[in-house]
Amino acid sequence: MLEDIQEANGVLVELATSMLEDISKKSFDKSPTSLNGIINRIAEKWMSEYSWVKVNISVNILEEYRISEDIARVIFDNLILNSIQQNTHKDILDIDIVIKGTSDAVTVIYRDNGVGLGRAYLKEPFRILEVHETSRDDGHGLGMWIVHNSIRSVQGGVEIIDGNKGFLIEFRLGETR
C-alpha cells in the first residue's frame, strides 16, 4: 500500500512539474482564448494520466467566452489536482464542470463525488481560500489560494463552497478583455 501511495505521489509530482513547465514556457500568456477549448484540453490531459478520474463537462455559453489559457489552466488544474489528491482511495472519481453565461461573464460550477472538505472547514468553507489553509496532512495550503486569486484577476469571485457531499465550488469569471 505504501508503495502504491509513493508511486501515486511520484506521478503527481511529474504532472505538476509538467503543468509548471507549460506555464513557464509561455511566460504566462494573457491573450484570450476560447474557454470551451481550454477546458476540454485540460480534462483530456488529466483523464489520460488517471484512468479512474472522469471529468464531465457541460458548456452553455450564449456567445464564446474568452480567457487567458494560463489563467484557466491555473484554476482548473489546481481544482482537479486537489480532487485527485483528496480522493486517491476512490475507484472512480467523478468531476462535473458546468459552465454557463455569455461572452462577458460565466458561472462555473465544479463538483466532485469525493470526501469533501475536512471537518475544520465545513462550518467556514471560505477559509479554504486563505493562504496556508489545508485539510491534507501533506498539503501546503496554496492551491485554493491560487485558484481564488486567479479568479479575482479576471474580475470574478467565488460564490459558493460546500464540502458536505463531495466538494463543490461555484464561481464567476468576469470580463477578460
List each model region and its residues:
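Conserved ATP-binding N-box helix of the HATPase_c
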Residues: 69-90
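Detector for a conserved hydrophobic position within an alpha-helical segment of the HATPase_c
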Residues: 151-152
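Glycine-rich/acidic phosphate-handling loop/turn and adjacent ATP-lid/helix
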Residues: 111-136
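Conserved glycine-rich
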Residues: 156-157
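Conserved catalytic submotifs in the C-terminal HATPase_c
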Residues: 54-64
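Conserved DHp (HisKA) dimerization/phosphotransfer helix of two-component histidine kinases, i.e.
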Residues: 1-52
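Short beta-strand/loop element within the Bergerat-fold HATPase_c
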Residues: 92-104
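Glycine-rich phosphate-binding loop
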Residues: 137-146
